[in-house]
Amino acid sequence: MMGLPLMAVPMLLDTGADPVYLARQWARMYYYGVRTMPPLAITTFILYVWTIIRRRSQHQAWYILAVAAVVTMGMIPFTWYVLAPTNNALFRLAEGPEAASGTTAGSLEEVTELLVRWNKLHIARSLFPLTGVVIALSDAM
């Protein structure tokens, strides 16, 4: 998940001069990310649940893994409530001025500001599964 904020978004910011094109590039990155990241998160959650069920059936401690699973999935409400407004603003700008009457294309400064905000929020979102892994590893040691 950190590849996007550490490499992809800085590359977009370095190469984009047209605000609509820059927003469209972000929208393409989002398109591929949304097809990859949620299945990975769901798979991770299923693995946590499977391990929790195994441990419970063997009367072993499982609470820490449950905390790790919940923390990992915390990125979903974070995305819906914190990141969605920025996503929606970038999607509107990616549509360009021709998409809706009376709409003007965003300035390069506006798109850049939204991308920088999205980048910071995505880093924060990426910390949920990372924290979940750290919690799970602390249980394994």
From Swiss-Prot:
<feature type="signal peptide">
    <location>
        <begin position="1"/>
        <end position="19"/>
    </location>
</feature>
<dbReference type="GO" id="GO:0016020">
    <property type="term" value="C:membrane"/>
</dbReference>
<dbReference type="InterPro" id="IPR013901">
    <property type="entry name" value="Anthrone_oxy"/>
</dbReference>
<protein>
    <recommendedName>
        <fullName>Anthrone oxygenase ptaC</fullName>
        <ecNumber>1.-.-.-</ecNumber>
    </recommendedName>
</protein>
<keyword id="KW-0560">Oxidoreductase</keyword>
<keyword id="KW-1133">Transmembrane helix</keyword>
<keyword id="KW-0472">Membrane</keyword>
<feature type="transmembrane region" description="Helical">
    <location>
        <begin position="64"/>
        <end position="84"/>
    </location>
</feature>
<comment type="pathway">
    <text>Secondary metabolite biosynthesis.</text>
</comment>
<feature type="transmembrane region" description="Helical">
    <location>
        <begin position="33"/>
        <end position="53"/>
    </location>
</feature>
<comment type="function">
    <text>Anthrone oxygenase; part of the gene cluster that mediates the biosynthesis of pestheic acid, a diphenyl ether which is a biosynthetic precursor of the unique chloropupukeananes. The biosynthesis initiates from condensation of acetate and malonate units catalyzed by the non-reducing PKS ptaA. As the ptaA protein is TE/CLC domain-deficient, hydrolysis and Claisen cyclization of the polyketide could be catalyzed by ptaB containing a beta-lactamase domain.</text>
</comment>
<comment type="similarity">
    <text>Belongs to the anthrone oxygenase family.</text>
</comment>
<dbReference type="GO" id="GO:0004497">
    <property type="term" value="F:monooxygenase activity"/>
</dbReference>
<keyword id="KW-0812">Transmembrane</keyword>
<keyword id="KW-0732">Signal</keyword>
<dbReference type="Pfam" id="PF08592">
    <property type="entry name" value="Anthrone_oxy"/>
</dbReference>
<keyword id="KW-0503">Monooxygenase</keyword>
